[in-house]
Amino acid sequence: MTGDVRRLPDGHAAPALNPLTGIKLVVLTGLSGAGRSTAAKCLEDLGWFVVDNLPPGLLDTMVDLGVRSGGAINKIAAVVDVRSRAFTSDLYGALGVLRNRGTALRIVFLEASDDELIRRFENVRRPHPLQGDGRLADGIARERELLRDVRGVADLVIDTTNLNVHELRGKIIAAFSDDNQPALRATVVSFGYKYGLPADADLVVDCRFLPNPHWVDELRPLTGRDDAVREYVLAQPGAQDFLDTYSKVLGTVVDGYLREGKRYLTLAVGCTGGKHRSVVIAEELAERLRRLATAESRIDVQVAHRDLGRE
C-alpha cells in the first residue's frame, strides 16, 4: 500500500457552503490508528470546528448548532469511529437526514495496512478498541469489516501506510485549505525580560545588545512607536546588520515551517522593559516577515506589544 489519495468521481477539494444552512460538514472516520487524530488537529488548524468521538446520531444536532451560531461556526469536522454494531446503519441514517436537508457534507476515510496498524499499536502499547480478549490483528480485521461499506461511499480515502505526520497534514491541507487562508500565521510580540518570557514563543530575539533609549532623557518617556525612538534605535551600530541577518534566518525558518505543515509562528522580541528597543525591532521584523510572503504562500503577520504601558 502507498500513500495514495482516492477520490470518487464527484468528489471535490472541499464541500461548498449550502445556501440553506451555510454549513460545511466533514465526517472523519476510518481505521483506528490510521491518523484520525492528526487529521482532526490539522482541520482544527485550518479553522474547522472539530468534535471528537461524535455518535452518528448527533451529526444533525451539530449542524443545527452551527446554524444557530449565526455564522460563528460554518465548518464542522466530526470524528466518528466504531463503537457498536449499529455504527454503519446509524451513520447512513444520519447522513441521509443531512443530505435531505441539503447540507454540504463530505466523508473522509483513513486507512493503513494491517502490518502498519499493528506496528503503531505496539509502539504506543495500547489495545485496539475492538480487540477485546483476542489478538490485535483480530480487532483490526473486525473494524476493517465493519467499515467496509463506509469506505465504499467515502468521498476521500487516504492510505497513511507510508505517510508520516507531516505528509498526512499536507494531504489534508491540500484537500480542505481555504484559498483565502494564509499558509502561515505569524505573531511578533515584544516583551520585557523583567516581566518574563512569553510562554508561547517559538523563537526569541534579545535586543539588549543595543543601547537603551531609557538613558536618553528626551527619549525616556517615549516608546518604540515614536519616530524619535525608532530612529535612535535603528541608527545604532549593529542594528541594520542584525535586521538583515535575522531576516535571512526568518526566511529559512518560514520555509521549514511551510514544508513541515506548521501554520503558526510566534516570534518574541525582548529588551529590558519591553518599552523601547523590542518595540522597534518587533515592528521591523514584522515588516520583514511580510516581505517573505509569496503568491503561493501568503503570510498573515500580527504584531503585539505585551508589556507596553506597564511602566
Curated annotation (Swiss-Prot):
Q: Where does GTP bind?
A: 81-84
Which UniProt keywords are listed? ATP-binding, GTP-binding, Nucleotide-binding
Instruction: Specify the signal sequence span.
Output: none
Q: What does this protein do?
A: Displays ATPase and GTPase activities.
Query: What is this protein's record name?
Result: Nucleotide-binding protein Acel_1111
Q: Does the keyword Repeat apply?
A: no
Q: Could you say which residues bind ATP here?
A: 30-37
